[in-house]
């Protein structure tokens, strides 16, 4: 009896029509997929993307070379070298982040006592070779200078929750 039922089921293509009915059901509904390059998904104020080094309003870089971000980084993606200034303060001579190692956990941003290193909202970056994802101090400062207004706005939005 079961064999006869299977024979007529395959002869009448019932599985095919069940699938077509399901396809037809969703074919005319509103699409939920975003067309990515033209339509962007909104990100939260706490989104962790590309890193940036910030400056004070007078143009001096904020990093005081305390190396807390280097120590707290679980992926060992941050490398810092510093030197002593004439006035006794330390400043960085080298600040590198290897984005191929970085896991974007945000520990570096949380540990920074002067809000020097931040993770921006930028997630659309790429590299054609491995060295393109190795950010130096000058590159990080350039990102910070370019997006300072956006960084400050997002940090102000997030301030009540910190």
Curated annotation (Swiss-Prot):
Residue positions binding [4Fe-4S] cluster 2: 73, 102, 105, 108
Topology relative to the membrane: Peripheral membrane protein
EC number: 7.1.1.-
Keyword Zinc found: no
Catalytic activity: a quinone + NADH + 5 H(+)(in) = a quinol + NAD(+) + 4 H(+)(out)
Residues in 4Fe-4S ferredoxin-type domain copies: 53-83, 93-122
One Gene Ontology biological process: aerobic respiration
Binding residues for [4Fe-4S] cluster 1: 63, 66, 69, 112
Top-level class of the enzyme under EC nomenclature: translocase
Cofactor(s) required for function per UniProt: [4Fe-4S] cluster
PROSITE patterns recorded: 4FE4S_FER_1 (PS00198), 4FE4S_FER_2 (PS51379)
Alphabetized UniProt keyword annotations: 4Fe-4S, Cell inner membrane, Cell membrane, Iron, Iron-sulfur, Membrane, Metal-binding, NAD, Quinone, Repeat, Translocase, Ubiquinone
Any one cellular-component term (Gene Ontology): plasma membrane
Cofactor binding, per record: Binds 2 [4Fe-4S] clusters per subunit.
Pfam families (UniProt xref): Fer4_7
Superkingdom of this protein's organism: Bacteria
Record localization: Cell inner membrane
Alphabetized HAMAP family for the sequence: NDH1_NuoI
Functional description taken from the UniProt entry: NDH-1 shuttles electrons from NADH, via FMN and iron-sulfur (Fe-S) centers, to quinones in the respiratory chain. The immediate electron acceptor for the enzyme in this species is believed to be ubiquinone. Couples the redox reaction to proton translocation (for every two electrons transferred, four hydrogen ions are translocated across the cytoplasmic membrane), and thus conserves the redox energy in a proton gradient.
Family statement: Belongs to the complex I 23 kDa subunit family.
Subunit structure: NDH-1 is composed of 14 different subunits. Subunits NuoA, H, J, K, L, M, N constitute the membrane sector of the complex.
Protein name: NADH-quinone oxidoreductase subunit I
Organism: Bordetella pertussis (strain Tohama I / ATCC BAA-589 / NCTC 13251)
Organism lineage string: Bacteria, Pseudomonadati, Pseudomonadota, Betaproteobacteria, Burkholderiales
Gene name per UniProt: nuoI
